[in-house]
Amino acid sequence: MHQEKKMLAHISEDGTRVQTVADHLQGTAVLCGQFAAAFDAQQQGTWLGLLHDIGKYSTKFQKRLQGGEKVDHSTAGAQVAARYGQIPLAFAIAGHHSGLPDGGGRSDTAQDATMFGRLKKSVEPYTQWTNEIKLPSIPPQPEMMKENRFTQAFYTRMLYSCLVDADYLDTENFMSSPKARGQGQTMDELLKRLNQYTAKWSHPQGTLNQRRSSILSACTTAGQTGRRGLYSLTVPTGGGKT
């Protein structure tokens, strides 16, 4: 019985260890799902991790690991995500090395670096991924995605950030021993410090500082009483946004 060759994602710097594509995808999926759970998108995060590097199943990428020419390995996953209607995921996958692409337009060609262009691009065959990676059920469309374009864009950027971190950390864990990182202060501790710092602004002097104080108060009230979600802040330069 023919046994398929193991497809590799990484080789250690000393050449003594390898990480298969399947192991990397699954490891990244776990981390990305955990990160995205913070904004109720764990399923989407899992999909991102499982699809982001399926282009590494191509023979051309395997040759790249042995010193061959560079090959685009991110477009494949973006195209699969788009076929399932997961456009925010497609953007995140397409840009997880080079940054989020512009959307572009339907007239864009496969030579364009836009999202429309990437979706038309021919990629190296990577069929073995379906034998090793099983996608869970299609993630539901989050309620927040029905609100407005700003929310959709912010949500896409959050997913992108989760994927970039998860991909980097899983690769780092393979390449070297996991690095101990301090957890830092809790959000409650940071909020306490912020409140202590801004307490001196409770009696602002002058019209500008009064306006700044009013803006801060509006933001604080929204955070305490508003429903969970994504908010935008439109304030002119000098208004104290930071």
Listing of model-derived features with the role each one plays in the protein:
Residues 21-27, 206-229:
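N-terminal pre-P-loop "Q-motif" helix
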Residues 226-242:
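Walker A/P-loop
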Residues 1-200:
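Accessory nucleic-acid engagement/destabilization modules that flank
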Residues 189-217:
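Flexible, low-complexity segments enriched in proline/glycine/serine and punctuated by aromatic residues
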Residues 56, 211-212, 241:
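Basic side chains
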Residues 149, 205, 235-238:
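Hydrophobic alpha-helical scaffolding
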